[in-house]
Design a protein with these regions (language model features):
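Non-transmembrane functional regions of envelope-associated proteins
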Residues: 2-244, 295-370
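Transmembrane alpha-helical segments that form the functional core of multipass membrane systems
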Residues: 347-419
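Regulatory cytosolic signal-relay segments
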Residues: 404-460
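Catalytic NTP-binding/metal-coordinating core of nucleotidyl cyclase/transferase enzymes
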Residues: 453-535, 582
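Alpha-helical scaffold within the catalytic cores of cyclic-nucleotide enzymes
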Residues: 490-505, 521-562, 566, 587-598, ...
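Catalytic strand-loop-helix junctions within cyclic-nucleotide turnover domains
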Residues: 518-528, 562-580, 599-604, 646
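Cytosolic regulatory/linker segments at or just downstream of nucleotide-handling modules
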Residues: 569, 598-647
Length: 647
């Protein structure tokens, strides 16, 4: 049964830990990740070598939307033929020809066809091609022109996520020199962009992102290799980045940058209309508004984000650093990461499990060896230490789980201390039940409730001590068998114990056939003398009831004598460091014992001292029996027999 309980407890703990892990890792960890990236990763602005040209609200105010494609042609003509820009990335997808202005379309196509450093965007789509045969032909042409040879060392077992690709107009398809995916995917829990798909899986092949395509061109990549955990790019400079599989692609975590002051962007930005004006000025033989040299050796991203236009041109998504992060800046961030090898790495699931197990075991060790207060102190230190290491890790571009391990530790400690409290409470009850058969329940309560302060020593206190003894016990024991004597004594003691407790008395010890009880300590009672008298009176009544019962059972008749004294005595723990006894000692105790023995001499049953009489004279009829000499005192003390109680 004990083993079964242990197994059930272990299973219950495992379920609690598992549920806690799922809740915290799924719902809370992604949000903590955002905070860590914002505060400890995004500490610097994006590279000066990457700039953005944005179709912003200013551009839409000047040129009515939708734009004629000759406006795009002017931007790319300026960048491609009048600057020394390294690369031009177009964060947009051209899917339909301009039926109203085919001349403008042709101007765009003619502009980009000889720009080998131009990379256009495309999207993988869930929708099916209207005509599957034409779609298959388009896919084949797209693959032949834009696919990068990739060595794939992983098996793709997931179902197809995409069914088609952005369908370029024929002229644009023919003119476009390079293409990369601009598809991004938000996190399923909080809807933030945390990672980016470097490779999109489409119908058995991998296609690169816009940033990866641009990096491959910039770095003269000769081979791209995909493994289970990494993407390896071999070129002028070899690059190896940590990746993970997610919905429809191979992703890596982005290292976000710090925003420019009063800007939504982390890279330097130009308005598209200023570039158009500059191109028109150059064609007119005038000085351009923006000097083309500003873009020398720069990588340029062109995209739209006109949030105030009301035309649906706001291209912004939530990221850890801001609620509306322009999409073109996210694409630029990706390339910036690749160029500077700044992608955020993370620990594997196995490593995370090891960390969690270590911290849970550490929590168990604390629970097993320390009290709740000490354990909480150690827990605080462990949490602060882990947070410090987590912050340091993020500063080094390495993401680790933060809230989940801490939560698992906390859950372990709550479970452990709760279990410990329950077990200790049960053990205390068992100890109290067992030891209560040997010592007073009240003394046991004092010990159990203040276990840490049990030590040698005590105090002086005013108490009343009661001794009760069976008359003629020695001669009776010679006539009865030991088991018969045991039955009588146990029945007698069992009968008087609740009477003593009822009157706030504490049985200090059984001495053969005698019992010694204390009133006033450890139970505080200002009326301890009165209660002792009432207790003795009830004990004598109970013995008379027992006499009738024993007589019917053929057992011998027994009488008891009671002696009570009130005075100052030493109360506390007596003995050695390893074995203590809670008791009361002093002349007050000795006189109470002598009074009980005087009953034999004076043929009485109930004697009290004069000091006790002073407290009970109003509730008892007494007669003076004698005067006795008290050790250490010159005057003799009167002793009284209690005849009856008047109250």
């Amino acid at each position: 049964m004990k083993n079964l309980k242990s197994i059930i407890i272990f299973i219950a703990f495992g379920i609690i830990i598992l549920v806690s892990y799922v809740i915290f890792s799924s719902f809370f960890e992604p949000r903590v990740y955002n905070l860590m990236v914002k505060n400890f990763v995004a500490s610097q602005k994006g590279s000066d070598g990457i700039v953005l040209v944005v179709i912003d609200d200013k551009s839409i105010e000047r040129h009515r939307w939708p734009w004629s494609r000759d406006l795009y042609a002017k931007i790319f003509d300026y960048m491609g033929h009048y600057t020394n820009a390294k690369l031009i990335g177009f964060d947009a997808v051209v899917t339909t020809p301009d039926e109203n202005n085919p001349k403008a379309d042709q101007e765009l196509f003619d502009t980009i066809k000889d720009l080998d450093n131009f990379v256009g965007g495309f999207n993988p789509l869930r929708a099916m091609y209207p005509d599957q045969k034409e779609g298959a032909e388009y896919d084949a042409k797209f693959k032949a022109k834009f696919e990068i040879p990739i060595e794939n060392n992983i098996q793709i077992k997931e179902p197809a996520r995409f069914n088609s690709l952005s369908h370029y107009p024929k002229g644009y398809f023919k003119s476009l020199p390079n293409a990369g995916s601009v598809w991004v995917l938000t996190h399923p829990i909080d809807g933030f962009i945390k990672d980016i798909p470097q490779l999109v899986y489409y119908k058995g092949d991998f296609y690169p992102s816009l940033g990866l395509r641009m990096y491959a061109k910039l770095n003269n990549a000769k081979k791209i290799k995909v493994t289970k955990t990494h993407l390896i790019i071999s070129g002028d400079d070899d690059l190896k980045i940590q990746t993970h599989r997610r919905w429809g692609g191979v992703f890596n975590f982005l290292h976000f940058y710090k925003n420019y002051k009063n800007s939504d962007y982390t890279h330097k930005t130009y308005s598209a209309v200023d570039i158009i004006d500059s191109m028109e000025a150059i064609r007119a033989g005038k000085k351009p508004k923006i000097d083309p040299k500003a873009f020398d050796n720069k990588i340029v991203f062109v995209g739209a984000n006109a949030k105030a236009s009301g035309l649906g041109l706001e291209d912004a998504l939530p990221t850890p650093i801001q609620s509306k992060h322009p999409g073109v800046d996210i694409q630029a961030t990706n390339l910036d990461n690749l160029i500077h090898n700044q992608t955020v790495r993370s620990i594997s699931s196995t490593q995370e499990l090891i960390v969690d197990i270590i911290l849970v075991i550490a929590a168990f060790v604390v629970v097993a060896n320390y009290s709740l207060i000490a354990g909480l102190g150690i827990m605080v230190l462990m949490v602060l230490g882990y947070i410090f290491l987590s912050v340091l890790s993020y500063k080094l571009n390495f993401a680790v789980p933060v809230i989940t391990p801490i939560a698992l530790q906390l859950v372990t400690m709550i479970f452990g201390y709760s279990r410990k409290f329950i077990v200790e409470s049960r053990n205390k009850e068992k100890i109290k039940d067992a030891m209560g058969k040997y010592i007073s329940q009240d003394i046991m309560e004092n010990v159990v409730n203040d276990i840490d302060n049990v030590k040698l020593g005590g105090k002086k206190a005013n108490v009343t001590v009661l001794f009760a003894d069976i008359r003629g016990f020695t001669s009776m024991s010679e006539k009865l068998q030991p088991d018969e004597i045991s039955v009588i004594l146990n029945e007698y003691f069992t009968a008087i114990e609740p009477i003593i407790s009822k009157h706030n008395g504490v049985i200090n010890k059984f001495i053969g056939d005698a019992v010694m009880a204390i009133f006033g300590e450890p139970i505080q009672d200002p009326d301890h003398a009165v209660n002792a008298i009432r207790c003795a009176n009830d004990m004598l009544k109970k013995v008379k009831e027992l006499q009738v019962k024993w007589l019917e059972e053929g057992k011998p008749k027994i009488e008891i004598g009671v002696g009570i004294n009130t005075g100052e005595a030493f109360v506390g723990n007596i003995g050695s460091e390893k074995r203590l006894e809670y008791t009361v000692i002093g002349d007050t105790v000795n006189l109470a014992s002598r009074l009980e023995s005087y009953n034999k001499i004076y043929k009485t049953q109930f004697l009290i001292s004069s000091s006790t009489y002073e407290f009970v004279r109003g509730i008892a009829d007494v007669i003076k029996i004698s005067e006795v000499k008290i050790r250490g005192k010159e005057k003799k003390m009167n002793i009284y027999e209690v005849l009856r109680l008047t109250e």
